[in-house]
Amino acid sequence: IDEAYLKNNLNSLNTKDRAFINNVCMNSMRYLFHTKKILFLYTNKNPKLHERILLYSAITQIVFLNFKDYAVIDSTVEVAKKLKKFHGFINAVLKKICVDKKKLNSVSPDFKDLPLWFLKQTKDLKKYEKKDFIKNFFLEPDLHLVFKNKKCLLDFKENNYPTSTKSCFL
């Protein structure tokens, strides 16, 4: 990750652009189980890795972050073209998703949608425990920071990237 970060010279991006990239990446990871389920609803084939990554990111932006549909589709298709991926397939899937995006916002993964290694580790959970786990797993986390001294607090205020009016990345 560090090598890719340096290779693409992301340090040259301004604070707003870095915050945007972090926001999309973090939310794409947060909503991965949701976007997998959504993608499965709209395609019979299993896209290759790069196509899946582009689609997961685009679905997150369209359905959960409420970015402009046309902007997300256009930029995703352009990246797909540069990577020589099936841009027509990506375009078609994203256009279908845009039509249904309001109802897709309520798509929620089931316990069985979690990774196999996790299902094996939790096979002894009771049905109500699994239901509670899923209900709580996808809630937006609270973050409580404790600073040891005033200098750390001041450093924090100076070295963060706002992602919204309520949150930021360090």
Model region roles, listed by residue range:
Residues I1-L170:
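Class I Rossmann-like S-adenosyl-L-methionine
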